[in-house]
Curated annotation (Swiss-Prot):
Keywords: Cytoplasm, Protein biosynthesis, RNA-binding, rRNA-binding, Secreted, tRNA-binding, Virulence. GO terms for biological process: rescue of stalled ribosome. Belongs to the NEMF family. The gene is rqcH. GO terms for cellular component: capsule; cell surface; cytoplasm; extracellular region; RQC complex. Disruption phenotype: About 50% reduction of binding to immobilized human fibronectin, greatly reduced mortality in mice (tested with encapsulated strain D39). It comes from Streptococcus pneumoniae serotype 2 (strain D39 / NCTC 7466). HAMAP family: RqcH_B. It is found in: Secreted, Capsule; Cell surface; Cytoplasm. Associates with stalled 50S ribosomal subunits, binds to RqcP. Interacts with human fibronectin. One of its GO terms (molecular function) is tRNA binding. It comes from the Bacteria. InterPro entries: NFACT_RNA-bd, RQC_Subunit_NEMF, RqcH_bacterial. The lineage of its organism: Bacteria, Bacillati, Bacillota, Bacilli, Lactobacillales. This is Rqc2 homolog RqcH.
Length: 551
């Protein structure tokens, strides 16, 4: 079910009973299109979430906690000016549309009484949140600015007069008079599609359910449907404020708890996508630059292949110095390396010995270039490997991991810290319980955690796991120095799951004691080398991994 006007009617009733006469204590904007108000009401603190997201737009109380940006937006600064300490006078739905108006009162800087309306319009990609002066109807601020060039019907900019979205001819099913309703029910075709055009705020699921019940005693069936008590119901794919037929779902105490559960993974994945998009773009750009650099370096190294030829020519000129003429641009000598004659180019301005030294200098220069380029190539390859590991964890990260990965990229110099951006606190390492019911397995979810786990936490005798030859997490069996094969398999499956091979049917995983790992000098976080490992072959299983998670 969509967040339609029918659902909104029920949740507005819920919010009204909880929040009216409460005071707004804090206002934050954890994400670009979402707003959270902390409200004190009925001796309790509530968090009110307003979302103008194009897919997950909604209004609800939430138990979810959010990390707020260090630098508040202009929108938040204006809202704090007008709403901090404000009293909530009313919360109303506009007809049965997906628009909610919350009227608040407060005092300005000189103590005068002011009223404002916080409006949320839940309209797909056109969703918005606005603060409007109650008396003048002027927009004080809006979360998404919409100019005349974007919408000729109404301009949504600070200072503009607020104009509501265009209304339709459809009727409010909650307030329609019996006479008009009776006429419609008797004369109109009561299909779901037609019901949606006749009445405001009916999503597809609501209209389908209404069509199903309007078979006999239509007037009373209609009234009962819209007057029934709220009984939130959640299925795997949808939610409703009341149970619908053929919909075996989980009941909830209130609509806000239902929405928290329904949107938790969906909204978090989208937030992760939003937060990670900048980092992914940066990492992809750096990968592209370094791959291009590697090709160039390898091409330059290939050009040094004739270094040995210069050395041999210098040796031959030195050996047969008495046969080398002056004032000639070439000489043919016996090549004792190949037992074939060889023609050697000469500089007529130089003596035979100087020509020999010229070839030795060329050889030495190329030899130094080979070492320099070989070192550069190894460094570039290590950077590419590191960035690929960051890309892998970004694609598997949750919100907390994203913040840590950003901190990692700041520390490694790939991005700059924003002004006033705080240093991110290190998240605790994830723990998993092995199949023996007692062994703890630690997993690093980014390179800083990998570094900490492998070189600070793990004991030298403990077993360490990593997906073979692909980016992934470091995994350590903690405490158990003689784990069973089943526990080793558990750890290998964790290493496979938290790697680039997560979706593969079979992943090779290296297993080795921590003491055999080597950290190269100057190596990037999480980079290790090793030899003498054993390799296991496992299949990642997401359900098993989820069941093992301890914290």
């Amino acid at each position: 079910m969509s967040f339609d006007g029918f659902f909104l009617h029920h949740i507005v009733e819920e919010l009204r009973s909880e929040l009216v006469n409460g005071r707004i204590q804090k206002i934050n904007q954890p994400f670009e299109q979402e707003l959270v108000l902390q409200i004190r009401s009925n001796r309790q603190s509530h968090r009110l979430l307003l979302s103008a997201h194009p897919v997950f737009g909604r209004i609800q109380l939430t138990q979810t906690t959010f990390e707020n940006p260090a630098q508040p937006s202009t929108f938040i600064m204006v809202l704090r000016k007008y709403l901090q300490g404000a009293l909530i006078e009313s919360i109303e739905q506009v007809e049965n549309d997906r628009i909610v108006e919350m009227t608040v009162s407060n005092k300005n800087e000189i103590g005068d009484h002011i009223q404002a309306t916080l409006i949320i319009e839940i309209m797909g990609k056109h969703s918005n949140i606005l603060l409007v002066d109650k008396s003048s109807h002027k927009i004080l601020e809006v979360i998404k600015h919409v100019g005349f060039s974007q919408n000729s019907y109404r301009t949504l900019l600070p200072g503009s007069t607020y104009i509501a979205p265009p209304s339709t001819e459809s009727l409010n099913p909650f307030t329609i008079k019996d006479e008009k309703l009776f006429e419609i029910l008797q004369t109109q075709e009561l299909t779901a599609k037609n019901l949606q055009s006749l009445f405001q705020g009916l999503g597809r699921d609501t209209a389908n359910e209404l069509e199903r019940i309007l078979v006999s005693e239509k007037l009373s069936a209609f009234r009962n449907f819209f007057n029934q008590e709220t009984k939130p119901c959640l299925t795997e794919t949808s939610f409703s404020p009341v149970p619908f037929a053929n919909q075996a779902g989980e009941p909830f105490a209130n609509l806000s708890d239902l929405l928290d559960t329904y949107y938790k993974n969906k909204a978090e994945r989208d937030r992760v996508k939003q937060q990670a998009s900048e980092l992914i773009r940066r990492v992809e750009n750096e990968l592209q630059k370094n791959r291009h650099k590697l090709k160039k370096q390898e091409k330059e190294l290939l050009a040094t292949d004739n270094a040995e030829e210069f050395r041999q020519k210098g040796e031959l000129l030195t050996t047969f110095l008495h046969q080398v003429p002056n004032d000639q641009d070439q000489v043919i000598l016996d090549n004792y390396y190949t037992n074939q004659p060889i023609m050697i180019a000469l500089d007529k301005a130089l003596t035979p010995n100087q020509n020999a030294q010229r070839y030795f200098k060329r050889y030495q220069k190329l030899k130094e270039a080979v070492k320099y380029l070989t070192d550069l190539i190894e460094e570039t390859k290590a950077t590419i490997l590191y960035l690929e590991s960051v890309e892998t964890v970004l694609n598997q990260a949750g919100l907390e991991e994203i913040a840590e990965i950003r901190e990692e990229l700041i520390q490694t110099g790939f991005i700059r810290r924003r002004q006033r951006e705080k240093i991110q606190k290190r998240k605790k390492l994830e723990q998993y319980l092995a199949s023996d019911g007692k062994t703890i397995i630690y997993v690093g979810r980014n390179n800083l955690q990998n570094e900490e786990l492998t070189f600070k936490m793990a004991r030298k005798e403990e077993l360490w796991f990593h997906a073979k030859d692909i980016p992934g997490s470091h995994v350590v069996i903690s405490g158990n120095l003689d784990p069973s094969d089943a526990v080793k398999t558990d750890a290998a499956e964790l290493a496979a799951y938290f790697s680039q091979g997560r979706l593969s049917n079979l992943v090779q995983v290296d297993m080795i004691e921590v003491k055999k790992l080597n950290k190269p000098t100057g190596g990037k976080p999480g980079f290790v080398t090793y030899t003498g490992q054993k390799t296991l072959r496992v299949t990642p299983d997401s359900k098993k991994i989820a069941s093992m998670k301890k914290s």
